[in-house]
Structures are given as C-alpha cells and as structure tokens.
Amino acid sequence: YLIYDIEDNIMHKNPHSPGTNSIVNYLRGSGKILYLIKQADHVITSSPVLNNYCITVNQKKSCIYISSSVDTDNFIPSNNYNNDKKVVIGWTGTFSSKEYLDNLRDVLVKLNRICDFKLRVIGDFDYELPGVDLEVIRWTRENEVKDLQGIDIGIYPLIEDEWVSGKSGLKAIQYMAFGLPTVATNVGNTPSIIEHMENGWLVKSNEDWMYALDRLIKTPALRKKLGISARKKVLENYSKHVIQDQYLLILNRLE
C-alpha cells in the first residue's frame, strides 16, 4: 500500500522562501508530487484546503485531513500569567516566514509607546527592530521548549494568499500547547484552530493587532483564561496521542 502524507501546501510555491537549488527543485517536482497523490491508496493532508485539492487528483478519492500535532508531554506550560516581570511577546519561525513578522513592525513600535513589553524572536536569522526591546534567539531543538516557555503571548501574523490558505497552522498549535494566549491573523486554517476570545484572539487589521496585544499585556486574567483554554483544546484535538489514533484507523483500514 502507498500512503502519502503531505504536510506542506504542495498546490503552490511559497512566494516568501528563498530560491532553492536545482537538485531540491527536481526532488520536489510538481509532476512527481501529482503522480504520488494520484496513485496513492490513501492521502493524508494537513489542511482542509489541501485535502479538497487532493480529492480532485487521487484516483480513489481516498483523502483525509488530519491536523498537525505536537508532543504535549514535552510542550508543557510554565506560565503563571502575572505581570511581576516584563511581558514577553514571542514569535518563532524561519527566514521564509520573516515577511509575516515584518508586517507587524509598525504595530510593535507603536505598541511599545504605550506598553512595556519585550519581543522574543526565535528563528534561524538575525533581526533588528529599533524602538522595541528585542531578544533574538537562535532556534535549536535542545532549547526549543525552554525558549517557548519564556513567552507570555504568542503571535502568528500571516497574509492572505494561496500559499497561506493551505498551511496547517502548526505554529498556532505550538503556542497553544504551552498555554499561551495566541494572537493570529484570521486567514487560512487558523480560524478552525483558534476560537476567537475562547482560546485565542483572531485579528484582521493593524488596529486589531494593537488592541489585542494592548489588552493582553495589561490584563493577566485574560491571558490566563485564553491560555488555559488553548492548552485544553490542544490536549483534546492536536496532541500526538489523539492524532496517532487517527493514523492507526487508516492503517487498519488498509490491512
């Protein structure tokens, strides 16, 4: 049996990533991907949009959306949700997603004039943001948990395009696993993960970002409410223990 598990949005090229070399392009050739989708006995996708696309290609119409998952035994909250120290707003990502963070530069500079906070950027690149208390941390697997546990508010800015429409929303799930109140752009798969003002905060405009971050910085009780609910949703829906059962159902069906 051939089971094809697709994590990335293979429908579209990421317009924000740097160019790759010819070998990588060959290995990722769209023709090979389409062939595998078509021939697979079952296709597993990481977003509803991606799943709908694969159904039109797979000859057996045997496709299912299974969300990205996190290790909730390792991704453990450590936040006490108080303001006894400067609140840390955190973002994590790679250089290819840096543009999304860049879109918040003006918001963060303006926010710093009315709120006392630190911005923690965890990634694989250097970053500068004059006018903001900034901490840049190089991402490592060994320190990932510790670095994310040091955040009070997770931010997940995106833009509305075809690439984002097929993304899984894993970054939001990661923040939520740590019990972090997460502010995210209301596009793509994010609204199916974050329920506005129940376990996170969905925004559209720069004004929305300003208001949400200002409220969360100044209201520890709201951070706690959203953060605890976020952790609960991840445990019930996105934990590796929950997701592995969905994979087992598919494997057993193919026997």
Can you annotate each of these PLM segments?
Residues 69-77, 82-150:
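Conserved catalytic-core segment of nucleotide-activated headgroup transferases in glycan assembly
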Residues 1-14:
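Active-site proximal beta-strand in glycosyltransferases
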Residues 215, 222-237, 243-249:
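A short, well-ordered alpha-helix in the C-terminal region of glycosyltransferases
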Residues 196-207, 215-221:
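Conserved acidic donor-binding segment of nucleotide-sugar-dependent glycosyltransferases
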Residues 99, 142-177, 184-192:
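Nucleotide-sugar-dependent
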Residues 38-77:
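Donor nucleotide-sugar binding/catalytic pocket of nucleotide-sugar-dependent glycosyltransferases
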Residues 48-51, 121-128, 186-189:
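Short, polar loop motifs at secondary-structure junctions
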